[in-house]
């Protein structure tokens, strides 16, 4: 990294710091229905099956992908 990089970044972000930032006032209503234990279990299981299971399979078979046939 160059010595000038921090100076360049400071120059680019300096003008953005002076802009007024409006404060967001976000309010929401309470939920219509409380989530039950079964709903949470189904949600966590579906996240595991959709995201973690395929990535775990790819990572466990990584050596097979590296080999040239």
UniProtKB/Swiss-Prot annotation:
Broad class of the protein's primary localization: mitochondrion
Post-translational modification: In response to mitochondrial stress, the precursor protein is ubiquitinated by the SIFI complex in the cytoplasm before mitochondrial import, leading to its degradation. Within the SIFI complex, UBR4 initiates ubiquitin chain that are further elongated or branched by KCMF1.
Pathway: Energy metabolism; oxidative phosphorylation
Gene Ontology process terms (BP): mitochondrial electron transport, cytochrome c to oxygen
One GO cellular component, as annotated: mitochondrial inner membrane
Membrane-spanning segments: 37-60
Coiled-coil stretches noted in the UniProt entry, renumbered to this chain: none
Residue numbers on the Mitochondrial intermembrane membrane side: 61-69
Recorded family membership: Belongs to the cytochrome c oxidase VIII family.
Quaternary structure (record): Component of the cytochrome c oxidase (complex IV, CIV), a multisubunit enzyme composed of 14 subunits. The complex is composed of a catalytic core of 3 subunits MT-CO1, MT-CO2 and MT-CO3, encoded in the mitochondrial DNA, and 11 supernumerary subunits COX4I, COX5A, COX5B, COX6A, COX6B, COX6C, COX7A, COX7B, COX7C, COX8 and NDUFA4, which are encoded in the nuclear genome.
Protein name per its UniProtKB record: Cytochrome c oxidase subunit 8A, mitochondrial
Source taxonomy: Eukaryota, Metazoa, Chordata, Craniata, Vertebrata
Gene: COX8A
